[in-house]
Curated annotation (Swiss-Prot):
PANTHER family documented for this protein: FRUCTOSE-6-PHOSPHATE ALDOLASE 1-RELATED (PTHR10683:SF40), TRANSALDOLASE (PTHR10683)
Catalyzed reactions: D-sedoheptulose 7-phosphate + D-glyceraldehyde 3-phosphate = D-erythrose 4-phosphate + beta-D-fructose 6-phosphate
GO molecular function annotation: aldehyde-lyase activity; transaldolase activity
Catalytic residue positions: 83 (schiff-base intermediate with substrate)
Name of the protein this chain belongs to: Probable transaldolase
Family, per entry: Belongs to the transaldolase family. Type 3B subfamily.
Function, in words: Transaldolase is important for the balance of metabolites in the pentose-phosphate pathway.
GO CC terms: cytoplasm
Source superkingdom: Bacteria
NCBIfam families recorded: fsa_talC_mipB
Organism: Geobacter metallireducens (strain ATCC 53774 / DSM 7210 / GS-15)
InterPro entries linked to this entry: Aldolase_TIM, TAL/FSA, Transaldolase_3B, Transaldolase_3B/F6P_aldolase, Transaldolase_AS, TSA/FSA_arc/bac
Pathway the protein takes part in: Carbohydrate degradation; pentose phosphate pathway; D-glyceraldehyde 3-phosphate and beta-D-fructose 6-phosphate from D-ribose 5-phosphate and D-xylulose 5-phosphate (non-oxidative stage): step 2/3
GO biological process: carbohydrate metabolic process; pentose-phosphate shunt
Amino acid sequence: MKFFIDTADVNEIREAHELGLVDGVTTNPSLIAKSGRKFEEVIKEITGIVDGPISAEVVSLDHDGMIREAEELAAIHKNIVIKLPMTPEGLKACTTLTKKGIKTNVTLIFTAMQALLAAKAGATYVSPFVGRLDDISQDGMGIIDDIKTIFDNYGYTAEIIVASVRNPIHVLNAALIGADIATIPYSVMLQLAKHPLTDAGIERFLKDWEKVPK
């Protein structure tokens, strides 16, 4: 399974990349706003760190506006993937961009049927939001399982990006289901490497080492 990092913080991206964990990056307007920097400046810097897909989201809600923004973003770097909202206009834009050879990531997906529509429109990636579904007492990972089954049944090539990841269990379940990608906040990436028995083992080794004659 591939790991994308879900952030626009270039320091987090750089640190995760140095760990060898980053296959790609997902950003959105909210994450860019948190960085306090200009949008294009952030995206360009990210392309210099990670040699993999970098999702950048359009903010227009109409087809023509999305296409205009998408072409501007795609011109920044060959690795840019255009994030589109899961709406009728977004699907229309996805179809147009696919014909132009521009990669797309249809986002804000909350049902398996929405993912199917995105795949039929030619999406390169689909991004179901598991954490937000869990927040309203729905089964986020169950949606991932359904999407995987549908795509396997019909041979869709769109890759599943498990998004809105809140904890290591989300990542574990995504891997068990067979999702292609999990896009993970840096804080959760660090949690994946942690276990209290690992920490206790290191502490014990160090204490034992102190007893070794020098």
